[in-house]
């Protein structure tokens, strides 16, 4: 029986960007739909000169392991009942499932004057912005020394602890980087595919997923990479509870909802897409 996909719920953000939402999504059906839509947009641009709105797909996947173009079978450490799908995105092996926010970027890069490097940096910095805002909003002594950062040597977003505020004793030189922080793990992954200047695939942020699924693989090809989720650093609740006008969390309301995080990230990406948030200097090596 062929894989089928539910209808996507569509919402326009502006004339050049729309969102589409999908829950309990089958990976193969979603990939087929992304590729089909991308090829359709390429054809419309080449044959008719039409610029179609870019699309940000907000997806909640059923459990699946995916092998990117650089993926190696040896990075799958255990065989489970979870499907393993070979795909055409960049990167190696990862897991998708419930409690993880996946956003697919179906963008015409030429129309927004982005290079592939620009897109990757915008993706990482958007995640940094929103995760750091959420970490700060908790005002917790357990998380006020934690920050989200990208790395030049390994795509994605990672959490770092500021050792200077965590302990009075001086850490040894082999424990930390020169800026007095230590990486504690990875919270977000990314992998894109570019076809004739159009992107698809995208980013995945661990919000309140079951991290044990990562134990069966070397995430993104890195043996022993510690995967993290936001729910272990802030109070999260999946119940819909978006505050009016998407206001930041206040001191007396420290519970973050899945929907709040999603909306903040959509807003940040939309502003970057419109040119309203410039890129910062790239992360140090």
Swiss-Prot record:
It is an enzyme of class 2 (transferase). The active site is at residue 220. Disulfide bonds: none annotated. CDD domains: LipB (cd16444). The record marks 186 as: Lowers pKa of active site Cys. The keyword Acyltransferase applies. Keywords: Acyltransferase, Cytoplasm, Transferase. Pathway: Protein modification; protein lipoylation via endogenous pathway; protein N(6)-(lipoyl)lysine from octanoyl-[acyl-carrier-protein]: step 1/2. Its EC number is 2.3.1.181. It catalyses: octanoyl-[ACP] + L-lysyl-[protein] = N(6)-octanoyl-L-lysyl-[protein] + holo-[ACP] + H(+). It holds the Pfam family LplA-B_cat. Residues 50-277 form the BPL/LPL catalytic domain. In the reaction, the free carboxyl group of octanoic acid is attached via an amide linkage to the epsilon-amino group of a specific lysine residue of lipoyl domains of lipoate-dependent enzymes. NCBIfam families: lipB. This is Octanoyltransferase. The gene is lipB.
